[in-house]
Curated annotation (Swiss-Prot):
Transmembrane segments: 402-422
Domain notes: The protein kinase domain is predicted to be catalytically inactive.
Organism taxonomic ancestry: Eukaryota, Metazoa, Ecdysozoa, Arthropoda, Hexapoda
Organism: Drosophila melanogaster
Name of this protein: Putative inactive tyrosine-protein kinase Wsck
Gene: Wsck
KW Aminoacyl-tRNA synthetase (keyword) present: no
C-alpha cells in the first residue's frame, strides 16, 4: 500500500499515521521539522453560530484569522469560507463530524474552512505543548469548584501554512491538579489541599471540601512520558477562582440590652466574626415574645414594620446597618425605636410599652452577586444585668446636698462602729469558749469507710485526714503560698448570683481587679470552719492537683486566692455559656437547609480542643472524674474551656443540679470510685457524641437508674449513630467505649484521629438537612440530665 500525503486538517487515519511515523524516522537530520516553526491547534468542527455573523473579517487562511483573533485577545479563531470570526466560548454539545467541514480555504486548498452550516475552530494559542488549553471554571458552589479545559489531541497540532500534523516527541500521561489558598475570610486554621491526579482523557474535574468565599489559585500541570527522561512536566495552566459565599458562621453573640423606655430599647452590639464570607450588613430584628409560646420567627415573613402589620406577625426588621468597612465591626451602641431610617428599613418606635421584647440579629454576606443571610435569635439572657449596670445617685449642687451627704455619713459611720464592736466581742467569746473546752471539739465516733459519689471535680479516696484543725490550716497555708494572692479590696462580689453549690461551699460571680483592669470571675466561697475532716482532706487533694496544672488555653484560668479570717475564695475565669446550651441553641428548624448554625469544621475543632485539654490533664496525672457537656464552656470567640475544679454549675434558673451519671464509664457506675484516665476517655467520647448530636441526651431511651444504665451498657448499648455522622468518626467514638478500660483509645489517639478528619470535615459528618426527609436529631431531654429531687 502506498503512503500518500494527507490533505486538509482532518485527523489522520491510523494506517496513515503509522506510515508517516516511518517516513519521519527515515528522514535525514536536515529534513526534520524545525522546532521553532509556528504551529496552531485545530479544535474541531462545530455548528455555525448566528451571533458571530455581524463581527466577521476577511481572511483567506486559518493562520491569518488566528493572528487577528490572538491580537484581539480571543481564545478561538472561527472560519467559514473566507470569513473570520473570533470567539471565547465553545459549546461541547455543538461539535459535529469532522467530514462536514469540507469547504477549502481560498489561499490554501489543502486546508478546510468550515462547511454548510458548520464552522472550523482553531485555538489562538501557538504552542506545541500538550498542556491544558482554555482552563476555565464551569461551576462553583460554597465548597467546590469545577474545572474544565479543552481536550488535547496530538493529531490536531498543525504547522502554520501546512496541513500535516506535527508528531509529538512526548506522550501525554496524566494531569496533576492542586489548589492553594490566596485569600480567605476564615480565621480557622487552613489545611493544605491535596494534589489530585486525573487521566489525560479527562477534560473536567471537581475540587471539593473547599472553604466558602475563598480565593484559590488552581494549577493544572500536564505530565508526559518520555523515552529518555521518563515522566516530566510538559505544560501547565493556572486560574484564580473564588468559591461561593456561605451561610455566615459562627453565630454572633446576642445583643445586650442596656436600658429600655416605653418607646425605645438601647442595645450593645459586640464585634462579629464571619468565617464564610464578608460581613456586608447587619439586620436588627425586633420580636415581641409571648412567654406562654415561644417559636422561631419565619424568615420568609420577615420584613419592614409596615409589612409586619399587614401580615400580622410579631416581628420585623428595624434597621439595616452597613458592616462593609473595618471600622463598622466594633463594639457599638444602637437605639431601637429612634424613628430614623437605616438602609431599607425605618426604625419605628415601639408600640407595645408593656410587651416583652427580644432583639435578634441577621448577618448578611454578599459576594459576587450571591447573598446568604443567617439569623441569630435573641433569648432571655440578653436581659440579664451584670455588675457593670449599677446606677449611682447624684445630688444637685447646694445646701440640701451637703446636708444629705452629712446625714448619710453619720448614719453609716455609726453602723460601721457598732459592727466593729460586735465583731470583736463575738470573736473574744468564741476564742475563750474554745480554750475552756479544748482544741479539738470533734465527737469521737467509730467511722467505717463510706463510698459516695462526689459532685466536685476530683474524688479523694485514700487521703489521710488532718490530725487537727491547726494541722489542716497549716497544710492549706503551705499550698496557698504557691498561688497568687489577691487582696480582698480587689474583689467585687455579686452574692445574690449563685451559679453552683457543692461540698466545699457555694459558687458566686463577681469581678477581680488586677493592674487597673477588671475581669469577670467566679468565686468558690469556702468557710473553712464548716468543713469536717473528710471534706478537708478532699479539699487539700484538689488543691494539690490544681497546683500541678499550668495555664492551658483550653482550661478555665485560675486567677488566685483571697483569704480573710472567716472566708476563703478561689478565683477562676468566668464563662457563662456551657457547651450543652450552645449546642442545643444552635439547632435550626425546618425549612432551614441546615440542621444547625454551626459548621462541621467548628464541631470537629471543638472535639479536638477538648481532646487536647484532656490529654494535658492526663500528662499531669490528673483525673477529671466529672467530664460532661455541663463542665465545658464556649467563649465569645468560639473556643472551648474546661472546668477542672468545683461542682457543676446549675442547669437553669431553677437551680437544678446536673447529674453526670450518663457520661460515666461502666466501671465507675459499678464501683463509684474506680476513676482513671481511661474512664475519662469514655466520658470524652460521650461529650464528642453530644457535639455531633447537637446537645442530644446520651442514652435518651434509658431511665436515670444507675443499675439499669449499667445493664444497658453491658448489653452493648451505646449512644446511637446519627444518620449524618459517618463511619470514620463514629468508629473513633466506639474505640473509646470498650468495656475493658485497657482496650480504649487514649486522649492523644482521639486528638490525632479528629485532626485527620478535620482535613475533610464533610466526609466525617454533614449537617445539611435532607430534602423531604424527617429530622434525625437525637432528642434533648433535660429531665434525664438533672439530679432527681425528692418529693
Amino acid at each position: 500500500m502506498e503512503c500518500g500525503s494527507h490533505s486538509g486538517h482532518r485527523p489522520i487515519p491510523i494506517w496513515l499515521s503509522s506510515c508517516l511515523v516511518a517516513m519521519c524516522l527515515g528522514l535525514p537530520l536536515g529534513a526534520a521539522v524545525p522546532q521553532e516553526a509556528p504551529a496552531y491547534y485545530y479544535v474541531g468542527c462545530y455548528t455555525a453560530r448566528t451571533d458571530l455573523l455581524h463581527e466577521s473579517v476577511y481572511a483567506k487562511t486559518p493562520q491569518t484569522c488566528i493572528e487577528i483573533c490572538e491580537h484581539q485577545g480571543h481564545h478561538y479563531a472561527v472560519l467559514a469560507s473566507e470569513k473570520c470570526f473570533c470567539a471565547n466560548v465553545l459549546e461541547p454539545q455543538e461539535q459535529q463530524d469532522e467530514q462536514l467541514c469540507n469547504t477549502r480555504c481560498l489561499a490554501n486548498k489543502a486546508q478546510y474552512c468550515g462547511g454548510v452550516g458548520v464552522h472550523s475552530y482553531y485555538s489562538t494559542i501557538l504552542t506545541k505543548q500538550p498542556g491544558p488549553h482554555h482552563l476555565r471554571i464551569s461551576n462553583k458552589t460554597e465548597n467546590s469548584l469545577t474545572l474544565s479545559w479543552n481536550a488535547y489531541e496530538a493529531r490536531k497540532l498543525l504547522l502554520a501554512g501546512g496541513a500535516e500534523a506535527v508528531l509529538p516527541n512526548q506522550l501525554l500521561d496524566n494531569f496533576l491538579i492542586k489548589a492553594q489558598v490566596l485569600k480567605t475570610y476564615s480565621s480557622l486554621p487552613a489545611f493544605p489541599q491535596p494534589e489530585f491526579m486525573v487521566q489525560s482523557t479527562e477534560t473536567q474535574f471537581e475540587l471539593t471540601d473547599l472553604h466558602p468565599a475563598t480565593l484559590y489559585n488552581i494549577s493544572v500541570r500536564a505530565m508526559c512520558k518520555d523515552a529518555q527522561v521518563g515522566q516530566s512536566e510538559c505544560g501547565q495552566a493556572s486560574i484564580e477562582a473564588t468559591t461561593e459565599v456561605g451561610l455566615p458562621s459562627p453565630v454572633p453573640a446576642q445583643p445586650k440590652i442596656l436600658s429600655r423606655t416605653d418607646r425605645t430599647v438601647t442595645i450593645e452590639l459586640s464585634p462579629i466574626r464571619n468565617d464564610n464570607g464578608p460581613l456586608s450588613k447587619l439586620l436588627v430584628i425586633v420580636e415581641y415574645v409571648d412567654n406562654a409560646l415561644s417559636q422561631p420567627f419565619d424568615a420568609q415573613l420577615l420584613g419592614s414594620w409596615q409589612q409586619a402589620q399587614q401580615d400580622g406577625v410579631p416581628y420585623y426588621i428595624a434597621a439595616e446597618l452597613d458592616y462593609d468597612r473595618p471600622e463598622d465591626n466594633r463594639t457599638r451602641r444602637f437605639v431601637v425605636g429612634d424613628g430614623k431610617r437605616y438602609g431599607r428599613f425605618t426604625n419605628k418606635p415601639l408600640d407595645q410599652p408593656d410587651a416583652h421584647v427580644h432583639i435578634s440579629l441577621g448577618l448578611v454576606s454578599t459576594l459576587e452577586g450571591v447573598t446568604k443571610t443567617m439569623y441569630s435569635r435573641g433569648t432571655h439572657d440578653q436581659h440579664v444585668t451584670s455588675l457593670d449596670d449599677f446606677s449611682y445617685a447624684t445630688f444637685e449642687k447646694g445646701q440640701s446636698s451637703v446636708v444629705a451627704l452629712a446625714v448619710t455619713c453619720v448614719i453609716f459611720g455609726s453602723c460601721l462602729l457598732l459592727s466593729l464592736i460586735a465583731y470583736f466581742y463575738l470573736r473574744y467569746k468564741t476564742c475563750r469558749g474554745r480554750r475552756l473546752t479544748g482544741g479539738n471539739t470533734h465527737e469521737m465516733t467509730l467511722q467505717t469507710p463510706i463510698i459516695e459519689r462526689e459532685n466536685n471535680g476530683y474524688l479523694v479516696e485514700d487521703d489521710p485526714l488532718p490530725h487537727s484543725p491547726e494541722n489542716f490550716k497549716q497544710q492549706l497555708q503551705q499550698l496557698v503560698e504557691g498561688y497568687e494572692r489577691i487582696p480582698r479590696n480587689a474583689l467585687r462580689l455579686n452574692v445574690n448570683d449563685v451559679i453552683g453549690d457543692g461540698r466545699f461551699g457555694e459558687i458566686i460571680t463577681g469581678k477581680v481587679s488586677t493592674n487597673d483592669f477588671a475581669r469577670d470571675c467566679t468565686l468558690h466561697v469556702l468557710c473553712l470552719d464548716d468543713l469536717n475532716g473528710t471534706t478537708q482532706a478532699q479539699l487539700l487533694r484538689e488543691l494539690r492537683q490544681l497546683s500541678q496544672l499550668k495555664r492551658q488555653e483550653h482550661l478555665l484560668d485560675f486567677y488566685g486566692v483571697s483569704a480573710s479570717p472567716d472566708w476563703f475564695y478561689l478565683i477562676f475565669e468566668q464563662q457563662r455559656m456551657s457547651l450543652k446550651r450552645k449546642l442545643v441553641e444552635s439547632r435550626l428548624m425546618a425549612p432551614s437547609p441546615r440542621l444547625t448554625s454551626l459548621s462541621e469544621q467548628l464541631v470537629l475543632q471543638w472535639i479536638y480542643e477538648l481532646a487536647s485539654a484532656m490529654n494535658y490533664l492526663s500528662s499531669c496525672q490528673v483525673v477529671h472524674r466529672q467530664l460532661c457537656s455541663h463542665s465545658v464552656f464556649v467563649t465569645s470567640d468560639f473556643k472551648l474551656k474546661l472546668s477542672v475544679f468545683g461542682p457543676l454549675p446549675y442547669m437553669n434558673i431553677a437551680r437544678q443540679q446536673p447529674d453526670h451519671n450518663r457520661w460515666l464509664a461502666p466501671e465507675v457506675l459499678r464501683h463509684q470510685h474506680h476513676h482513671s484516665t481511661r474512664s475519662d476517655v469514655w466520658s470524652l467520647a460521650c461529650v464528642a457524641w453530644e457535639c455531633c448530636a447537637l446537645g442530644g441526651t446520651p442514652y435518651a431511651n434509658a431511665v436515670a437508674s444507675n443499675q439499669q444504665l449499667l445493664e444497658a451498657i453491658r448489653a452493648a448499648v451505646r449512644p446511637a449513630q446519627p444518620a449524618y455522622v459517618y463511619g470514620d468518626l463514629y468508629q473513633l467514638l466506639l474505640n473509646c467505649w470498650q468495656l475493658e478500660p485497657s482496650e480504649r483509645s487514649s486522649c492523644e489517639d482521639v486528638a490525632f484521629g479528629v485532626r485527620q478528619l478535620m482535613t475533610s470535615p464533610r466526609h466525617a459528618l454533614s449537617f445539611d438537612r435532607v430534602a423531604g426527609g424527617l429530622d434525625t436529631l437525637p432528642p434533648y431531654l433535660p429531665q434525664l440530665e438533672a439530679v432527681a429531687t425528692m418529693g
